[in-house]
């Protein structure tokens, strides 16, 4: 037992010895660490020359200075952020617009040089002011939420009148046609010396110009090139289009009345002309015997054409030769368009019979009056590669005056309401190579035209008529998916007579508040409208070129009516 006790005591002594050495080691280690820290602090103090407590007084000052430097640096960073925002949000878009302006200028100049090489001209190529770049031929109002009729026209604004007026009581200026591209606009009208009903001789005024902004910020149209085609040719029903080579114009050459032309057996002569950037005009007769071999009368649609895919597209209407291939292809075809919430009470069979008869009005000897579209390649050679598209009458109503428009990436054909359907029509149009396809139209029920009974403004049933007046709508309000919501236009707000011109914004059912030209008894006739935006101010304007009665100097005066499009946020 003693051995056991001794063994336990020995183990306890060994354990105490180990604990003692551990304690000694720990104390030595701590002393070594403290000494190391002391030497390090002394070395640091010596290196910083902060050997006295008084030297520590400068630390708060140093901290304050450091704080000021940090604040200044943060301020500089904010300046950088502000400059970046300004660059991204403001300067870069403007720079892009200026770049687009330069590009468009270069393209126009190049086009002019190509044209100038053919006519030995040395004049410069025109282009709109940079304020308008990106605001012409675009979807101007893209809005899915607002009521279309919350947009409305301002009062008419005073601006430079770029349209010549008659200078005698017997003078007549009629049938305006207008088109505007990203670089320039084109305008034309007919000039008759002895009253508006004379068909034997006339002049054709043709002008090329650009949009400018005055020093006070006002919009004005500046005519740069113009010509009055005063020769032995009697050009009628002319349509104009702004193309990269100038102002292309399509006219019929007329020597007889419209009724006589429809009763003839040969197509109407047509001419493709161009006013170049140098102010020189050239034209070429089309081979109508080949192009319009199935027609007895053929006319441009009066409204502007459109430059699409290297070709210029013009609206066409006229009479088909009975039993010709084109006439036979349309036999039995018809379409009936209905008024909004106002159904025709006639029996369906009777409606169909009247709809079919509407394409062959008695006024033109029972000839089928047909809609068509003509495309011509734009090159230094006039009248090159013309191609005629005749759409089926399962889509279009009786042929009538019209206009081809391009807004954004969408193309449209306006068709005058010469037949029974009074509301304005815009057919979506797609192009494939050299031909066009028309689709079911947008209709604007409140945008009507006056007409003779039974095809007056409120008419709702198919009938055979030749009536109405040319008043085209311009696509203004779009959905985000590019479908059309609303248009701007100047209509004649009367049931039967060509009276009371008013401007408004229209959706498919109703219209906005109106801007009236004058009293409800004011006589008027054709109107053609085009809208654009001043990108610099983000203001949208619409131009309505309207034939307004003028009792002192000629029967009509063509007036360019300018409005700004405003918005009523309460609607």
Swiss-Prot record:
Principal subcellular localization = virion
Q: What is its EC number?
A: 3.2.1.18
Q: How does it sit in the membrane?
A: Single-pass type II membrane protein
Q: Residue ranges of region Involved in neuraminidase activity? A: 234-239
For molecular function, the Gene Ontology terms on record are: exo-alpha-sialidase activity; host cell surface receptor binding
Q: Which domain of life is it from?
A: Viruses
- Pfam families membership: HN
| Membrane side Intravirion: residue ranges | 1-26
Q: Which compartments does it reside in?
A: Virion membrane; Host cell membrane
- Enzyme's top EC category: hydrolase
GO biological process terms, alphabetically, are: symbiont entry into host cell; virion attachment to host cell
Residue ranges, Virion surface side: 49-571
Q: Which UniProt keywords apply?
A: Disulfide bond, Glycoprotein, Hemagglutinin, Host cell membrane, Host membrane, Host-virus interaction, Hydrolase, Membrane, Signal-anchor, Transmembrane, Transmembrane helix, Viral attachment to host cell, Viral envelope protein, Virion, Virus entry into host cell
Annotated stretches, region: Important for interaction with fusion/F protein: 124-152
- Reaction catalysed? Hydrolysis of alpha-(2->3)-, alpha-(2->6)-, alpha-(2->8)- glycosidic linkages of terminal sialic acid residues in oligosaccharides, glycoproteins, glycolipids, colominic acid and synthetic substrates
Enumerate the glycosylated residues.
119, 341, 433, 481, 508, 538
Per the record, GO CC terms? host cell plasma membrane; membrane; viral envelope; virion membrane
Q: Which residues cross the membrane?
A: 27-48
The text the record gives for the protein's domains is: The C-terminus (head domain) is involved in binding the cellular receptor.
Q: What does this protein do?
A: Mediates the viral entry into the host cell together with fusion/F protein. Attaches the virus to sialic acid-containing cell receptors and thereby initiates infection. Binding of HN protein to the receptor induces a conformational change that allows the F protein to trigger virion/cell membranes fusion. Neuraminidase activity ensures the efficient spread of the virus by dissociating the mature virions from the neuraminic acid containing glycoproteins.
Recorded family membership: Belongs to the paramyxoviruses hemagglutinin-neuraminidase family.
Query: What's the protein called, per UniProt?
Result: Hemagglutinin-neuraminidase
User: Which gene underlies this protein?
Assistant: HN
């Amino acid at each position: 037992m003693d051995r056991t006790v001794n063994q336990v005591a020995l183990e306890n002594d060994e354990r105490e010895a180990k604990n003692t050495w551990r304690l000694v080691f720990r104390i030595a280690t701590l002393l070594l660490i403290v000494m190391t820290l002391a030497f390090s602090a002394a070395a640091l103090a010596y290196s910083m020359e902060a050997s006295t407590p008084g030297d520590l007084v400068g630390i708060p000052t140093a901290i304050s200075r450091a704080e000021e430097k940090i604040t200044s640096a943060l301020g500089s960073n904010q300046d950088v952020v502000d400059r970046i925002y300004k660059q991204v949000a403001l300067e870069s878009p403007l720079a892009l617009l200026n770049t687009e302006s330069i590009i468009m200028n270069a393209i126009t100049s190049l086009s002019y040089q190509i044209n100038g090489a053919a006519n030995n001209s040395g004049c410069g190529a025109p282009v709109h002011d940079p304020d308008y770049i990106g605001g012409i031929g675009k979807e101007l109002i893209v809005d899915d939420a607002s009521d279309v009729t919350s947009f409305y026209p301002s009062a008419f604004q005073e601006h430079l009148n770029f349209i010549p007026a008659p200078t005698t009581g017997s003078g007549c200026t009629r049938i305006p046609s207008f088109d505007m591209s990203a670089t320039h606009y084109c305008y034309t009208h007919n000039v008759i010396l002895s009253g508006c009903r004379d068909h034997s001789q006339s002049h054709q005024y043709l002008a090329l110009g650009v949009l400018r902004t005055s020093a006070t910020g006002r919009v004005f149209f500046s005519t740069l090139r113009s010509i009055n085609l005063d020769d032995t040719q009697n050009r009628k029903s002319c349509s104009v289009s702004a193309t990269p080579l100038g102002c292309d114009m399509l006219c019929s050459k007329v020597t007889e009345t419209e009724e006589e032309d429809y009763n003839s057996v040969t197509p109407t002569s047509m001419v493709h002309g161009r006013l170049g950037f140098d102010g020189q005009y050239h034209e070429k007769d089309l081979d109508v015997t080949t192009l319009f071999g199935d027609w007895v009368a053929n006319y441009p649609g009066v409204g502007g054409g459109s430059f699409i895919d290297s070709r210029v597209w013009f609206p066409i209407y006229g009479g088909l030769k009975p039993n010709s291939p084109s006439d036979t292809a349309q036999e039995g075809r018809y379409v009936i368009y209905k008024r909004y919430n106002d159904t025709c009470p006639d029996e369906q069979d009777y409606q169909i019979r009247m709809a079919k008869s509407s394409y062959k009005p008695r006024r033109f000897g029972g000839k089928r009056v047909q809609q068509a579209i003509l495309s011509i390649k734009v090159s230094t050679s006039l009248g090159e590669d013309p191609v005629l598209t005749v759409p089926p009458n399962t889509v279009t109503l009786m042929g009538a005056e019209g206009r081809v428009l391009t807004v954004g990436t969408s193309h449209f054909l306006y068709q005058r309401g010469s037949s029974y359907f009074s509301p304005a029509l815009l057919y979506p149009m797609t192009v494939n190579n050299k031909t066009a396809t028309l689709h079911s139209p947008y209709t604007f029920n409140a945008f009507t035209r006056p007409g003779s009974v039974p095809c007056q403004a409120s008419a709702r049933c198919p009938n055979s008529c030749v009536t109405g007046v040319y008043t085209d709508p311009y696509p203004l309000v779009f959905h985000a998916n590019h479908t059309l919501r609303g248009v701007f236009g100047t209509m004649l707000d009367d049931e039967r007579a060509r009276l009371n011109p008013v401007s408004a914004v229209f959706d498919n059912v109703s219209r906005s508040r109106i801007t009236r030209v004058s009293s409800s008894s004011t006589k008027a006739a054709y109107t053609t409208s085009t809208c654009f935006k001043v990108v610099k101010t983000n203001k949208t304007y619409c131009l309505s070129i309207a034939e307004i009665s003028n009792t002192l100097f000629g029967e009509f005066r063509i007036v360019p009516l300018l409005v700004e499009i405003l918005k009523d946020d309460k609607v």
